[in-house]
Design a protein with these regions (language model features):
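N-terminal ligand-binding/catalytic initiation module
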Residues: 1-82, 86-89
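Rossmann-fold NAD(P)-binding glycine/threonine-rich loop
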Residues: 98-116, 211, 216-258
Length: 259
């Protein structure tokens, strides 16, 4: 019988921890966006709810230098303890130059290559919030990673690749699939855990999976539930709200590092 991996309780636990951290720390978040973002609105609403200080920079038609200059200014501002670039960036922007520019201790979503490197050698500094959300879900349900076959669908720099590093460090055997992968269904059939990060609606079906498979749907709708043989995260009140909670936890951590 299928099981829904409920995340609301975990969100509450993490936000309680964040509130406790706010009693001893005063973080200040800089949010950089390039268009209207539902994610940004949810994040700002949560900052207002928790009385977290923030500045929102919505850049209109910027070039790469505009963005890196702003990041450099925020790096030098002692009041700012966390910097977040909200994806997607405009196509004319060199996003990797922007990632490089963020101070590694203000990089609350772990996009700077140095933070990714530290994670790859199992010495994490700051880890991407969505990666943390995935790991916390698995841990909260006592799902061991050691020796498991884990398939990640999607090869994004921000999420899929650091997630693969985290899983490998936890002794999982990891396959990363993408648009050029042949015979995805065969890989899925052999997977103990599937983590989908594509945002492609109904990319695969639960009937493609073996009995007892765990599905973490980061893309919010990647899996079509057409059987009752798996455990899976819900489309709403799942990975998304948990990622925001983990991001705010990272913000408090960054504030501590910068003291």
């Amino acid at each position: 019988m299928s099981r829904v991996l409920e995340c609301s309780t975990l969100v509450s636990v993490i936000l309680t921890k964040v509130k406790k951290g706010l009693k001893k720390n005063t973080p200040f978040l800089a949010i950089i966006t390039f268009n209207d973002s539902k994610y940004c609105k949810l994040l700002i609403d949560k900052c207002l709810e928790l009385d977290i200080h923030f500045k929102h920079y919505n850049l209109y038609n910027p070039n790469t230098r505009d963005v890196t200059s702003l990041i450099d200014k925020l790096n030098k501002d002692d009041e700012i303890t966390g910097i977040l670039l909200v994806e997607p960036l405009p196509k004319n922007i060199d996003k990797y130059a922007c990632y490089d520019a963020i101070n590694i201790n203000k990089d609350i979503d772990g996009v700077n290559p140095i933070n990714q490197y530290y994670l790859s050698i199992n010495r994490p500094n700051i880890v991407n919030s969505t990666v943390l959300a995935v790991i916390k879900i698995l841990e909260s349900y006592n799902i061991s990673l050691s020796g498991k076959n884990v398939t990640i669908i999607g090869r994004s720099y921000n999420i899929s690749r650091p997630l693969a590093s985290y899983l490998i460090n936890s002794d999982a055997t990891v396959s990363m699939c993408h648009s050029k992968t042949r015979d995805l269904v065969s890989l899925l059939k052999n997977s103990d855990i599937v983590i989908s990060v594509t945002g492609v609606n109904n990319l695969f079906k639960s009937s493609d999976l073996k009995d007892g498979c765990i599905v973490i749907d980061v893309g919010l709708g990647d899996v079509l539930i057409d059987s009752d043989n798996i455990s899976y995260t819900p489309k709403t009140k799942g990975v998304g709200p948990l990622s925001i909670a983990c991001l705010l936890e990272n913000l408090v951590t960054s504030c501590k590092k910068l003291k």
